Amino acid sequence: MRFFFVFLAIVLFQGIHGAYVEIGYSLRNITFDGLDTDDYNPKFNIPTGLAVDPEGYRLFIAIPRRKPKVPYTVAELNMVMNPGFPVERAPSFEKFKKFNGEGKKDLVNVYQPVIDDCRRLWVLDIGKVEYTGGDADQYPKGKPTLIAYDLKKDHTPEIHRFEIPDDLYSSQVEFGGFAVDVVNTKGDCTESFVYLTNFKDNSLIVYDETQKKAWKFTDKTFEADKESTFSYSGEEQMKYKVGLFGIALGDRDEMGHRPACYIAGSSTKVYSVNTKELKTENGQLNPQLHGDRGKYTDAIALAYDPEHKVLYFAESDSRQVSCWNVNMELKPDNTDVIFSSARFTFGTDILVDSKGMLWIMANGHPPVEDQEKIWKMRFVNRKIRIMKVDTERVFKYSRCNPNYKPPKEIEV
């Protein structure tokens, strides 16, 4: 029997600098059609990452198994059948439709899906659930594994799998975001590198798909330089401190190298390193500090818009999304807020899809140590939000556009 996610979706429009951010889906909890809610707890189904394939009209979310009875760790939505607006009915997520093939394993625990320039969907399956008891024994235990699926082919077959060696990480559950670097998009897509962040080890793991080999780098710039705050229920606050978390790739040069921009989750600084250095095992890194975005701008996720040369940041506690043009000096005066809402509770992921659409997601679930306290929180508004806006609209009316001219002030 095929089960479906069922949740209430609403559409709102938020005006920011003349642009509009569409709230396509907002959820209090995710439930599953065909399953009695007595058999599982819907509040444990918290998505942490998303990926969008506009060519195939598919949206993917990752739901890690941090609590028992999470039916699917990767799910998808048909955006033709469920565009998000107008609200005619509740859209239905499905289990990720893939063909494993003989001997292939199902996914155990995924935090982040990523689609590369060759329309391959990548996930890092960390290899174990994050609890004991309950249904934990029904899931196999293994190493963190990178897996790729071909979105261009029927049934989305698995086409690549690589286990991360034990000596490259200290814990399976502290991986952050990752990026896939296809060196030559007009050639063989297997000439690719994957850059995996680890916010506990403050390390960056590099996987060479051609050689099927991985290595890691550590650097002081990967470390947290402050303590982050998550504000909840008025004056109540929670603290957390995490290192390297978000990574985004800039424009390629003639040799196929590009800047890899990165942020620690507990920092407001932005750094980059040339991927030429990352592609060499035991190479020397020469990080570049671009600047500081200013107080209260901590973020765990960022995304690059190649059309407009802009980085976007899903901020963690400010409940807003900001931008910075990479051709400008990085300082607060050269950044801008393109979205702000009290209902945007903890930005967890952000991306620019292949059609130039900016997607952002909040889930109300920061990486604090006292996770049990998070699970017990009550939200007045729907905490899970997936929104989108055309980057052209955002760019045109923000300071991230070098030609932007603010409206004249009216003298009174």
Curated annotation (Swiss-Prot):
Subcellular location: Secreted
InterPro entries hit by this protein: 6-blade_b-propeller_TolB-like, Royal_jelly/protein_yellow
One Gene Ontology CC term in the entry: extracellular region
SUPFAM superfamilies listed in its UniProt record: Calcium-dependent phosphotriesterase
Glycosylation sites: 29
Top-level taxon in the UniProt lineage: Eukaryota
Tissue expr: Salivary gland.
Main location: secreted
Sorted UniProt keywords: Glycoprotein, Secreted, Signal
Signal peptide: 1-18
PANTHER family: GH10609P-RELATED, PROTEIN YELLOW-RELATED
Function: Probably modulates blood feeding of sand flies on vertebrate species by binding and sequestering different mediators involved in the host response. Binds biogenic amines. Binds serotonin with high affinity. Binds noradrenaline but not adrenaline. Binds dopamine and octopamine. Binds histamine. Inhibits host smooth muscle contraction induced by histamine in bioassay with guinea pig ileum. Immunogenic; elicits antibody production in the host. Functions as a chemoattractant for host neutrophils; likely acts through a G-protein-coupled receptor and effect is dependent on calcium influx.
Protein family (similarity comment): Belongs to the major royal jelly protein family.
Name the record gives this protein: Yellow-related salivary protein LJM17
